[in-house]
C-alpha cells in the first residue's frame, strides 16, 4: 500500500489516531501489507499475495490450532472474538 493510500485510509478509518502514529505502527507490524500474516513462533514460506489467499492461509492456520496475527495492524487471532473480528473481515484494511 502506498503512502497516500495509507494516509487516506487512516483519516477515514481512524481519525482519532494521529497519522504519524498509525504510520509507525503499521510500518513495523506489516510493512503496509494488508494481507500480512505473522505466525507466532514460526513463519510462512511466503506471504499471501491477495485477500483470498490470505483468508485461505489464515483459515488453515486456525484449523491447525496455530497462533497468528493478521493484517495491517497484526491483530492476533486470540483477540478476534473480543473485537468482533472474523478470519475474513480482519483482512479489511479499515476494520483492521
Model-derived features with residue positions:
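Catalytic glycan-binding domains that act on GlcNAc-containing polysaccharides
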Residues: 1-96
